[in-house]
Amino acid sequence: YVVGEPGIDSFLRHQLMTRSELAEQLNLNASKQWMLVTLHSETKESLDYNLQMAENLYNVMIGQKNVQFVVTKANADFGGSQINKYWDAKQDDDVRVVASLGQLRYLSFMSQVECVLGNSSSGIVEAPFLGIPVVNIGNRQKGRHICKNVICCGISQQEIEKAISYIVDYRLIDKFWGDGHASEQIVQHIKDYLNDKQRNYR
């Protein structure tokens, strides 16, 4: 059975936070545009490659006008701690760096942004459900299904800039990963299977 990604169910299970609530908690300006950044390392590449990827993305970020960014830190993969140190050094009024937003704030913030930048699986799986444009950088997610709201690009500054220039055309809802009712369908399929098994046993 194909039921979708259970993680999508969180959007329907939670009461998402408002823009004003997010602005207050994250010390952001609600009148500015927001973008969400999560950049993990590419473990098959060198540390220099990964730091260059982060630097290229940052250079694109500071060129955006009237935009504030929330950067969630990289995971524990090779190179992740160095990427996090890089972001910590770049934090300012328009670049907020957090270790984690937590599920509710993350989903709420994603629903309010102009786009998602980086290479996190949340840009591949969760963002399409909301129709939020995604600029997927590099090869970390290579081989996964790419929904119609996702723009894939290389790691150079020029490629990232070009991809961001297209985001207005990529605000497209894509429910390839599910409709938010995967858990219900899983439970129902298990019940149906057990009922069929009981009938056959009798």
Tell what function each PLM region has.
Residues 1-3, 98-99, 151-156:
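Short acidic-hydrophobic, aromatic-tinged amphipathic segments that line or gate anion-handling sites
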Residues 128-172:
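Nucleotide-sugar donor-binding patch of glycosyltransferase catalytic domains
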Residues 166-202:
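C-terminal amphipathic helix plus adjacent low-complexity
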